[in-house]
Amino acid sequence: MDAAGGLLSLGAYGSGVLGAWERQARAISNEGQIRRTRETDGVFMFGDSIGVQDGPALARQLTQLGISIAVHNWAGRPVTPAVDALDLWAQQYGLPHRILMSVGSNDIFTPPAVEAQVDRTMRIVGEERIVYWVNVQAARTGHGPDIKVSDQRNSAWINLQLADAQRRYDNLRIVHWAEHLASSPNRLARLLRDGLHPSVPLGQNARNGLIIEAIKAG
């Protein structure tokens, strides 16, 4: 969520305004890997800066389980353009049985946008595929207390939309990262390096572990 670095104002929801993200770091699989993943019914992943950071380690773990992965991870990106990328891959390559959505942290600036994009994701994917969506935790330590409170409130708002969507879609699985962090007093400090991005290796291993557990559970 590096696009959050320059806050021009508190924005409409108190967390600031999302900056330009299009020139930020990205990790996108080549066409050969995308097609192999589709043909072997692996996992398509769409993420933000957390995906850019943690995606390679997740890919190694999935490979050890015999599961291929193709990624479209882009730092600073909110949900809407991530779903655009999902739609494009669906049209160009078709989709495997499992889709991992690791986005939402950059939507603390405009939380109401998430619900429609979750619905859009589920329409693109259809009823026969499973979507794994990692929920969010943000309270950026580099900002003042008012912004951190807004971050936390907006994260909860996003997560509520995901929970509501799960009740509407039988094939939507929520990966409960926020609950994992909240379940022990020291986890926020140990598993997040800046109130948002997982620490390496502890936070990265914990978050990727939750994703692996969800995928293995089906």
Task: Map each language-model feature to its residues.
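N-terminal secretory targeting modules
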Residues: 1-45, 51, 92, 187, ...
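Conserved SGNH/GDSL esterase-like catalytic core that processes O-acyl groups on lipids
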Residues: 31-120, 140-146, 156
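Active-site loop/turn elements of alpha/beta-hydrolase fold enzymes
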Residues: 74, 136, 177-179
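Surface-exposed alpha-helical segments enriched in charged/polar residues
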Residues: 91, 119-123, 160-167
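Alpha/beta-hydrolase-fold catalytic nucleophile elbow
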Residues: 102, 134-135
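A short helix->loop->beta-strand "cap" motif at the edges of active sites that frequently abuts
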Residues: 126-130
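Catalytic His-Asp segment of secreted/periplasmic serine-dependent ester chemistry enzymes
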Residues: 141-218
